[in-house]
Amino acid sequence: SRLPPATRDKLADEITFFPA
């Protein structure tokens, strides 16, 4: 999806993104 690289590191991808 549209998640920052640091966030989509090991997350599902559609999970809530946390601003790094």
UniProtKB/Swiss-Prot annotation:
Q: What is its EC number?
A: 1.16.1.7
Which domain of life does the protein's organism represent? Bacteria
**What induces or represses expression of this protein, per its UniProt record?**
By Fe(3+) ion deprivation.
The entry's function note states: Reductase activity that acts on Fe(3+)-chelates and NADH as an electron donor and requires the presence of FMN for full activity. May play a role in iron uptake.
Keywords recorded for this protein, A-Z: Electron transport, Flavoprotein, FMN, NAD, Oxidoreductase, Transport
Group of enzyme by EC: oxidoreductase
Full protein name = Ferric reductase A
Q: Species name for this entry?
A: Paracoccus denitrificans
One Gene Ontology MF term: ferric-chelate reductase (NADH) activity
Q: State how it assembles.
A: Monomer.
Which reactions appear under catalytic activity for this entry?
A: 2 a Fe(II)-siderophore + NAD(+) + H(+) = 2 a Fe(III)-siderophore + NADH
